Structures are given as C-alpha cells and as structure tokens.
C-alpha cells in the first residue's frame, strides 16, 4: 500500500484515483494483494472461513468496479461495497475481541482499548479531512492489520504500544 503513495498525493486523493490513470495496472495488482492479505490474516484468527471468503469477494468486487462520472451506479457501488465490508470487518474484529475475553480477559481488555483508540483516530481523520483520502485508507488498513496481528500473536501489549506510538508519531509528522 505504501509503495502506491509514490503515484499520487495521499492527502488529496485516494487509491481510486489510480484507477483512472496510466498506473491502473498497479491499482488492480494492489486490489488482489490487499484482498488476499486481509483474507489470509483473518483466517489465522477465526474459523469462520466462509464468512471471510464472502466478505473478501465483496470487498474485491467493490474495489474493481469503475469509479467514473459516466458510470454513477458503478461509482456508488465502488464506494458503498468496500465501505460496508470495512464496517463489517471492524464489527467482526470487535466480536473477536469480545470472544477473547473468555480465555484472556486482561489481554482482551487491552486489545479493546487499542481498538477504541484506533477507531477514534480514524474518525478524527475523517472529520478533519472531510473525505476519504489515501491517508485514511492506509490508516484503516494498518489499524485492521495491527488488531489482527495482536489477536493472532497475543504478544505483550507493550510491543503493540511501541508500534502504535510509532504510527501516531508518523501520522502527526505528516500533518
């Protein structure tokens, strides 16, 4: 995802803007890799494989639909489908964290706090920029992968704190 930042300005555009340029090939490769990566990472933390495959397919279909003023229906679906899939994925992460409370209540509470912090940061970015741009897209992807990583590994939360602090400092620097 970060490599694609060299092809557009993340504060003013999002990844979809690559679809309408000569770099569209990279956009489609990114869509495939992103979908596979998220799908395989979710497989490591849950046994609901059919649900994840269904969600991943819808996410991919939404990403590859054309976003162009000549195709308003496709443009609407291009925005609505991936956004819905991300919201469902975030709700599913909250569900996984809730289930983690049964086996590791203290760790689950700490993960839930990180989950809340991440959602707050993303909401702050959406309010601040008043549109979905590349920075928000990258933040959401990093956030989902971070929570999945912590759920998968169940490592000490201090390591997770260092990673999130580094992300926060980097994002503050970009402002």
Protein language model regions, located:
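Membrane-proximal helix-loop-helix units in multi-pass membrane proteins
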Residues: 56-108
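Transmembrane helix-loop junctions and nearby membrane-interface residues
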Residues: 5, 9, 42-45, 64-68, ...
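Aromatic-anchored segments of alpha-helical transmembrane domains
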Residues: 2, 56-65, 118-127
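Membrane-helix interface and helix-disruption motif detector
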Residues: 17-25, 68-82, 128-137
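Hydrophobic cores of alpha-helical transmembrane segments in multi-pass inner/ER membrane proteins
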Residues: 28-40, 85-95, 140-153
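N-terminal topogenic module of multi-pass integral membrane proteins
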Residues: 1-44
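Cytoplasmic-side transmembrane-helix entry/capping segments in multi-pass membrane proteins
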Residues: 50-53
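Terminal transmembrane helical module of multi-pass membrane proteins
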Residues: 104-171
């Amino acid at each position: 995802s970060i490599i694609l930042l060299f092809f557009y300005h993340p504060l003013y555009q999002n990844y979809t803007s690559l679809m309408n340029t000569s770099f569209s090939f990279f956009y489609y490769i990114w869509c495939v890799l992103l979908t596979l990566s998220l799908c395989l990472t979710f497989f490591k933390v849950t046994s609901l494989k059919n649900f994840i495959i269904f969600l991943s397919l819808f996410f991919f279909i939404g990403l590859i639909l054309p976003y162009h003023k000549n195709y308003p229906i496709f443009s609407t679906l291009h925005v609505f489908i991936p956004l819905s899939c991300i919201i469902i994925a975030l709700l599913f992460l909250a569900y996984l964290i809730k289930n983690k409370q049964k086996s590791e209540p203290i760790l689950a509470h700490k993960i839930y706090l990180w989950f809340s912090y991440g959602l707050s940061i993303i909401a702050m970015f959406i309010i601040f920029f008043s549109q979905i741009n590349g920075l928000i897209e990258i933040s959401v992807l990093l956030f989902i992968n971070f929570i999945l990583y912590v759920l998968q590994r169940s490592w000490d939360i201090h390591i997770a704190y260092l990673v999130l602090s580094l992300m926060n400092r980097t994002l503050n620097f970009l402002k």
